[in-house]
Amino acid sequence: MSKFIPEGETYHVPSFQWMFDQTLESDSHHDEAIFVTESINESGVDTSVEITADGTLASYMHAVKPLVEDGLLNPPFDQARWGLCCKNVVDVYDGLLGYRLIPMAEAARMLYLEIDGSFVDESECDDWRPVDTSDGFTEAMFDVMNEIPGEETKNTCALSLEAESRQAPETSDMVPSEYTLADRYVTTREEFASVDSDYDISLNLVSPVEFRVGVCEDTYRHSEADDPTMPQYHDRISLKSLEAAGHHMLPTHAYFDDTYYQALEELGDYNVDISKLSVRQSDVDWYRDPEKYYEPELSIGSFQRRIGTQKTVLTALKKRNADVPELADSVDIKRVACEVAEKFKRAYLNHSGIGLLGQSMDVMSRGLEYHKKWKDHKDLTGVTVLSEINLQRYQHMIKSDIKPVVSDTLHLERAVAATITFHGKGVTSCFSPYFTACFEKFSKALKSRFVVPIGKISSLELKNVPLSNKWFLEADLSKFDKSQGELHLEFQREILLSLGFPAPLTNWWCDFHRESMLSDPHAGVNMPVSFQRRTGDAFTYFGNTLVTMAMMAYCCDMNTVDCAIFSGDDSLLICKSKPHLDANVFQSLFNMEIKVMDPSLPYVCSKFLLETEMNNLVSVPDPMREIQRLAKRKIIKSPELLRAHFESFCDRMKFLNKLDEKMINLLCKFVALKYKKPDVENDVRVAIAAFGYYSENFLRFCECYATEGVNIYKVKHPITQEWFEASRDRDGDWFHDWRNPKFPTALDKVWRFFGKYARDDPMKHIEERDRRHRLNRAMNSSLKLAYDRRSLSKDKETVAWVRKTLSK
């Protein structure tokens, strides 16, 4: 026997007769005797029914074969769970059509009973592979040779049977035509192309083979990345990506820090050239405590809070009020003023609304509104007592917040603070109702083509104003306030009289604007000015708007303008044809330096105007300016103040949700054209996405500043530049308020005994009478008089009530 045959077993010589005689293969008795076995049906289920996984009770009984005990099934039948298991199996098998899998019912049973295992049928899979020793003839070839014509082989695979049972019946014999790549890419032309190193075509690299190729064009371009109508996706917004975008847009603003600029200005030498000036000792402390303000996370050219010291005020006066340009020629002021006022009236006022100008102004109702505002808070600070006041004397101050710089000059020139010249609250409250009522009359007679965003129409969002195929005129008037002279004052007088403003008030207002005195009591600076605009009185915005409209009407034909927006010294003209503006008249007649932007864009009041699908206009703030406002350094550490800045930020970004991809793409091109920077379009997209992200809620906005949550603040170490949480309780903090009841403690009393601490109350041993005198002298005189008058009125009421009671 062979060593491969175990003892006790006989070796049968295999017969290959079946390869030539089909009768041996189809012996039914032989097949039944060997391969068919009878299964014992313990659950009483009819096994002759085809096993499927359709979620019914019958399929559950056939697949799971539960035991029946006292009428209950074990495991119990849960129809919802069994149906979900069957559905999951069908979904999985639809995606695994190329694999040999176990029957669906068995897979559903494994999921239902939570049995671990694989759905792949590995019963006939092994690592053994037969060695091909044939001479080219296979079993399939013999089957084809011996196939009986007209006889169909029936597929008995369980998976195929289940797939056939789930097939939906065809309702139509027509096959629908579907969209293919051949329909999308169409060959439009043919040309000859060469292949430099195609070895499959030719080995002659000196003279490469040229062959005809078809040039295809994509008929469905909406899925391309550069299509302007498709959205472009970016990474998640972060402070690092936003700061990188800001540094790329404004390279000179990167890591700008002016912490020590105020100290350098105060400690260095100073030279100023002003013709007439009065200077005395200043009482302003230029030190700025950095621990009182939020530290922004971004470093994109934001400025520190500017303090109005004497040198800072002199620098601001030098730029904003001194050195008035003298560009105009000698003209007849009275005649030219009448001509300008007449052109203003013909260009802007409607003929049907001129009759409204003769009506009386509703001044009393406007004065009542101001009185109600004062009554709500009853703030007596700055209220003028009924006495004689010099209207030619103006108070002066500087703006602590510096306007964002959008030019690449931050490394060469320090931005100068803007100045504010204003009357007291008493004078302003007296004149404001008159100018408010005058503007209401003016707006009723104004043509609808011209828009002045103030009051109830303060928004730049306009309806039915298309921007497509239009020309724009964007003019920049530099040195606008101090360039105004006597001519501007005179045609303002004529315009106010034509609008129905009372003549005595008009003449009075214009007369005390001829010569005025600017006074800054804290900085100790006084300077006389003449004719130029006062930047903080009751007529500032309305007057600047009237001056701009009058000069534009005199130098440009307003009949060709479809729409015009005027706001202070900002203006924007929208025309069907290219507008013509005589810039020489601005210089020779109105003493103004004007610069017409090229190209002129729909840009006004630091906002871009974009057109929606319904031909409406929405305004979007300038991203170059807003990205710097996210890094303000003047916000005091207070959750209420930080929330106020957040609400202001949300108000400016209220139209971001109306922007579609076309409008965003247009905005990016507008920014690139305005600032002559063609490579900032992607940075503008990052900035817009950041504006939408940080305007979602207050906590996201707090991420822009050194805060942890809302009420806990982080502090940066001045040397290690690390963030840490520190306590703010120091001995010096207790002495700021000598009325503090917590100080001193027992230990502090011991230290005071040895002379380390000073007294709590420096006025403790002073008599009550002397103390009251010192406190009253320290108070503001107008505030003291107001309090005294209020106390006197109460005393008079008390005396009158006592007398009335005694008389009864």
From Swiss-Prot:
Gene Ontology terms, MF aspect: nucleotide binding; RNA binding; RNA-directed RNA polymerase activity
Any single GO BP term: DNA-templated transcription
Keywords attached to this entry: Nucleotide-binding, Nucleotidyltransferase, RNA-directed RNA polymerase, Transferase, Viral RNA replication
Listed SUPFAM superfamilies: DNA/RNA polymerases
EC number: 2.7.7.48
UniProt key word Transferase: yes
Pfam families tied to this protein: BBMV_Gp1_N, RdRP_2
Keyword Nucleotidyltransferase: yes
Function: RNA-dependent RNA polymerase which replicates the viral genome composed of 3 RNA segments, RNA1, RNA2 and RNA3.
Assembly notes: Interacts with replication protein 1a.
Protein's name according to its UniProt entry: RNA-directed RNA polymerase 2a
